[in-house]
């Protein structure tokens, strides 16, 4: 950035005065349908969001209102509207305090809700960018970034009219919008469930198929974030969802019916996790036979949804799943080694996840015949160039260690080798010259040198203004501090945490590998990615706690509170304690999450 606002006030004023003319240029290119120049103009404003906040500050409110109107105008090209909505999403994410201070959240929310009605018969599952899908994304960010008074409360007030509308597009839009806002304001929405759930239940029985599909999506999203609260309504929700599933099962040649199948599986997958085992057990005989029929369906999404749901049913129902265990494992085993295509690898990951949940449900003895082939497949998965599948393998090892505890020792060589190789992966050479267009990549995944990298902004700080919302000490929200969070770093976060599960459950069997593991974890304490640091420190403390318990089992006196310490631990335990404490204190001052 060549212009320094603090040092060049005249130049800053000149630039600010040019903004209205720049907006006029954008408007004229949109009105004329000049795609190339319009896209350059949108890109210019996106770029300015990443520059000094002072550049847009004078006209920021007017610019936001212009983009709202542009995104809401149905007479212009959808691509231009989607660009305007994308700009608004970036504004909310990176100028959230400015947006909050303008008190424009309610208008953004209601405009976005109206745009969602344009979804029509298009599936919300599709990935093509449209104004309606962009509006759903805007609602998601609004709910996550702004207070309920500006987003969720006005949304809920408006939903009554949408839910009761004679137009199915409005009913569909209402429940989809509700689902998108749950994650951002779960606590507030939990207080309104007594009014929300009757409406959602009614929409599950709607005369229009797409509305019922949207209602299933809404239930899944509600249950994801409010599992316990939604789970209490299982007696009414599950029968309604099964009714949809059964109706759709009678017409599998229709894509909309397949969407209902997938939606039912996803909704029950999310909902049943919030049930107590005795409640989940009531539904096993109804759910498992229905879903298992889709293990061999040609639609990959249906197959994956059904397999994932059965895993969750097993996890929730525990021993009640045993009567179906042999048949289900026979149906799933054929997918454990598939690897002919990316779709095969995706499905293989879902299957391994579900098998891990099933193992936890039925216990060590019934699952024993399947452990060796599953462990062999999980070790092979590390070399299939599929990051998600590698993470699945690590999580599976964690589950198997919890189920088999010391008996997992026979698989420790392979598991430790895989985890160690993960932590030793090189993260150098992944630096990217993001430049001033980096904002276009924030939140996206890019592939560089065969590695998937998720680009994340390191700060959500907002710009200074006269509002009392900015009294907290904050830096200007410049984009100079954008970092890439690589898939490798995310893998390391999971691997470090899995180490903790394996160590704490295999206990003495892990001692031959302990020194090398602790050494590697200590190296990760100052990793650039917060998730890796937290996992490494957490596992180090779990390791110390496990060794302390083993020392007590060997005759050491139990710990007693007070100073000076009344228990003298073995020298090796003291040494580990000192290392862990020093590692913790070395990052203590700089960590936000202590």
What do the predicted segments below correspond to?
Residues 1-594:
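Karyopherin-beta/Importin-beta family HEAT-repeat alpha-solenoid scaffold
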């Amino acid at each position: 950035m060549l212009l320094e606002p603090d040092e060049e006030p005249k130049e800053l004023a000149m630039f600010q005065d040019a903004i209205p003319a720049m907006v006029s240029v954008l408007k004229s290119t949109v009105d004329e349908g000049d795609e190339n120049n319009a896209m350059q103009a949108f890109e210019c404003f996106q770029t300015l969001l990443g520059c000094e906040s002072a550049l847009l500050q004078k006209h920021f409110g007017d610019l936001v209102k212009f983009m709202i109107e542009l995104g809401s105008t149905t007479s212009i090209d959808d691509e231009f509207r989607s660009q305007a909505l994308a700009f608004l999403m970036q504004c909310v994410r990176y100028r959230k305090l400015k947006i909050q201070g303008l008190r424009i959240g309610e208008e953004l929310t209601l405009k976005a809700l109206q745009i969602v009605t344009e979804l029509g018969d298009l599936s919300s599952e599709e990935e093509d960018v449209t104004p309606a899908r962009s509006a759903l994304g805007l609602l998601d960010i609004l709910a996550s970034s702004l207070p309920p008074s500006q987003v969720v409360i006005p949304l809920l007030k408006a939903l009554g009219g949408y839910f009761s509308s004679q137009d199915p597009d409005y009913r569909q839009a209402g429940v989809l919008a509700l689902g998108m806002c749950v994650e951002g304001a779960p606590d507030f929405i939990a207080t309104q469930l007594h009014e929300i759930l009757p409406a959602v239940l009614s929409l599950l029985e709607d005369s229009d198929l797409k509305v019922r599909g949207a209602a299933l999506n809404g239930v899944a999203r509600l249950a994801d974030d409010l599992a316990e609260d939604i789970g209490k309504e299982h007696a009414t929700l599950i029968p309604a969802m099964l009714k949809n599933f059964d109706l759709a099962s009678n017409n599998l040649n229709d894509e909309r019916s397949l969407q209902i199948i997938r939606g039912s599986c996803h909704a029950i997958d999310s909902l049943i996790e919030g049930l107590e085992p005795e409640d989940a057990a009531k539904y096993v005989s109804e759910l498992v036979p229905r879903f298992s029929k889709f293990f061999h369906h040609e639609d990959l999404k249906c197959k994956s949804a059904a397999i994932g749901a059965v895993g969750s049913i097993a996890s929730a129902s525990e021993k009640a799943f045993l009567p179906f265990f042999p048949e289900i494992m026979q149906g799933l085993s054929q997918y454990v080694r598939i690897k002919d295509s990316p779709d095969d690898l995706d499905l293989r990951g879902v299957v391994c996840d579900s098998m891990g949940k099933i193992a936890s449900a039925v216990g060590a003895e019934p699952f024993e015949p399947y452990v060796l082939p599953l462990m062999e497949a999980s070790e092979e998965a590390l070399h299939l160039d599929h990051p998600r599948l590698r993470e699945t393998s690590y999580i599976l090892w964690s589950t198997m260690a919890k189920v088999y505890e010391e008996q997992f020792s026979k698989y420790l060589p392979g598991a430790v080798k895989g985890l160690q190789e993960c932590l030793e992966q090189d993260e150098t050479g992944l630096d990217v010259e993001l430049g001033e267009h980096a904002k276009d990549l924030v939140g996206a995944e890019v592939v560089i040198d065969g590695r998937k990298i998720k680009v994340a902004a390191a700060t959500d700080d907002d710009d200074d203004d006269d509002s009392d919302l900015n009294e907290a000490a904050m830096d200007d929200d410049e984009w100079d501090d954008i970092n890439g969070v690589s898939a490798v770093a995310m893998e390391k976060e999971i691997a470090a945490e899995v180490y903790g599960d394996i160590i704490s459950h295999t206990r003495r069997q892990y001692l031959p590998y302990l020194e090398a593991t602790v050494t590697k974890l200590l190296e990760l304490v100052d990793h650039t990615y917060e998730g890796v640091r937290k996992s490494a420190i957490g596992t180090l403390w779990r390791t110390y706690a496990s060794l302390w318990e083993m020392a007590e089992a060997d005759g050491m006196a139990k710990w007693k509170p007070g100073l000076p310490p009344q228990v003298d631990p073995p020298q090796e335990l003291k040494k580990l304690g000192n290392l862990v404490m020093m590692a913790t204190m070395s990052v203590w001052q700089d960590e936000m999450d202590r």
